[in-house]
Amino acid sequence: SSNKLTTSWG
């Protein structure tokens, strides 16, 4: 989930 959240920032 954390990785997906990072993508959101990108």
Curated annotation (Swiss-Prot):
Optimum temperature is 50 degrees Celsius. Optimum pH is 5.0. Its EC number is 3.2.1.3. This is Glucoamylase. On the 2D-gel the determined pI of this protein is: 5.0, its MW is: 185 kDa. It comes from Bacillus licheniformis. Keywords: Carbohydrate metabolism, Glycosidase, Hydrolase, Polysaccharide degradation. GO terms for molecular function: glucan 1,4-alpha-glucosidase activity. It catalyses: Hydrolysis of terminal (1->4)-linked alpha-D-glucose residues successively from non-reducing ends of the chains with release of beta-D-glucose. It comes from the Bacteria. GO terms for biological process: polysaccharide catabolic process. The keyword Kinase does not apply. Disulfide bonds: none annotated.
